A protein has these predicted regions:
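Carbohydrate-interacting regions of secretory-pathway proteins
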Residues: 21-231
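Bacterial N-terminal signal peptides
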Residues: 8-18
């Protein structure tokens, strides 16, 4: 093929590809969105209390660390999220108990009646540490996480949470510790055998609030919390 014919062929191919993409925008692959911080150095504008606007009494932000010591109102995001990847670092006090809720709604009086929970716990000293179903990184009361992955109290742990369509992954300190499918037969049977059975829309929302549990005793600190939306 001579050079003129080669240029003409390449031009035709590129024009055809552009026209195809324009006619079928859904065919163009879209990746994850950009990472976005959910915490500033001295404020938490992306969060509010479950019961009240703004940051409830007992929660504090300093040096990019969100913390509480003792029972306080739960926190929820101002914005709802459907498919996302969430990363954060957390440390908990001795016998501390907290959690990260996802796809929560305001249908019920507490977020935990609608939202699955990634458990944050001092496994060695909190009562919930006696069962893997309620230990650190478990999908609370539904899917257990293995022992020996969480670090002791007052040490920083790294969490990654992936929620896409019905697929959920819990990661702890670089290790995938829980994976499950929302609305699957297995998931439904576990919910039916749990305390969440009384709440028919538990875990069914396709998008909702992210929450941080504050109503249990003990100290909790969160830093480097960021999120990106997934296609």
């Amino acid at each position: 093929m001579n050079r003129t014919h080669l240029y003409a062929a390449l031009l035709a191919l590129s024009c055809g590809a552009a026209l195809s993409a324009a006619a079928n925008p859904a065919s163009v692959a879209s990746g994850p969105g950009p990472w976005r911080s959910l915490l500033q150095d001295h404020s938490a504008p992306d969060w509010r209390g479950w019961k009240e606007p703004g940051l409830p009494a007992g929660w504090h932000v300093a040096g990019g660390v969100l913390s509480k010591d003792g029972p306080v109102d739960d926190l929820v995001t101002n914005e709802s999220f459907g498919n996302f990847e969430l990363e954060l670092e957390w440390k908990i006090g001795r016998a501390g108990n907290s959690g990260i809720f996802y796809r929560g709604t305001r249908e019920y009086d507490h977020i935990y009646w609608s939202a699955p929970e990634y458990q944050l716990l001092d496994d060695a000293n909190a009562a919930d540490g006696s069962s893997r179903l309620t230990a650190a990184a478990a999908a609370y009361a539904l899917y257990g996480a293995p022992a020996g992955v969480v670090l002791p109290f007052d040490q920083w742990n790294k969490t990654r949470l992936v929620v896409k369509s019905t697929h959920v992954e819990h990661w702890l300190n670089g290790r995938k510790v829980v994976g499950y499918e929302l609305k699957s037969a297995d998931w439904k049977s576990r919910v039916a055998a749990s305390k969440f059975a009384e709440y028919p829309n538990y875990g069914l929302a396709t998008a909702g609030l992210i929450g941080l549990q504050g109503d249990h005793p003990g100290a909790l600190a969160i830093r480097n919390i960021r999120i990106r939306e997934l296609p």
